[in-house]
Amino acid sequence: MPTINQLVRKGRRDKTAKVKTAALKGSPQRRGVCTRVYTTTPKKPNSALRKVARVRLTTSVEVTAYIPGEGHNLQEHSMVLVRGGRVKDLPGVRYKIIRGSLDTQGVKGRKQARSRYGAKKEKS
């Protein structure tokens, strides 16, 4: 506990909030190159093969990013756009790849929430 005199001299210091997407360095998105594309299993009680990619960003930081949607065309050396947003059942995955930009194709046959998956409107 500081004395009144110490508080007069220094004052209280505000706590700084921890940044959840440090690798983006304050940007909404960052470009990167896939260094490895693979599947991993989620935490209990869920069971699946989640598609993830190891991405080297333009900030020269390597992160693990989730590939949302059904099916993808990503492979090593693909250019991707990465945004923040964690996947709750995959530890250490705090970024998501944006579908439909750069080398990433949109989800085919998607009818709802198309803008999230880079899917164009189907001709009726």
Swiss-Prot record:
Any one GO BP annotation for this protein: translation
Residues bearing PTM 3-methylthioaspartic acid: 89
InterPro entries according to UniProt: NA-bd_OB-fold, Ribosomal_uS12, Ribosomal_uS12_bac
Amino acid composition bias (Basic residues), ranges on this chain: 108-118
GO molecular function, one term: structural constituent of ribosome
Keywords: Methylation, Ribonucleoprotein, Ribosomal protein, RNA-binding, rRNA-binding, tRNA-binding
Gene3D superfamilies: Nucleic acid-binding proteins
Positions of the UniProt region annotated as Disordered: 1-32, 104-124
One cellular-component annotation, GO: small ribosomal subunit
Xref: Pfam families: Ribosom_S12_S23 (PF00164)
Xref: PROSITE patterns: RIBOSOMAL_S12 (PS00055)
NCBIfam families recorded: rpsL_bact
Role description: With S4 and S5 plays an important role in translational accuracy.
Assembly and interaction partners: Part of the 30S ribosomal subunit. Contacts proteins S8 and S17. May interact with IF1 in the 30S initiation complex.
Family the UniProt entry places it in: Belongs to the universal ribosomal protein uS12 family.
Name recorded for this polypeptide: Small ribosomal subunit protein uS12
Lineage summary: Bacteria, Bacillati, Actinomycetota, Actinomycetes, Mycobacteriales
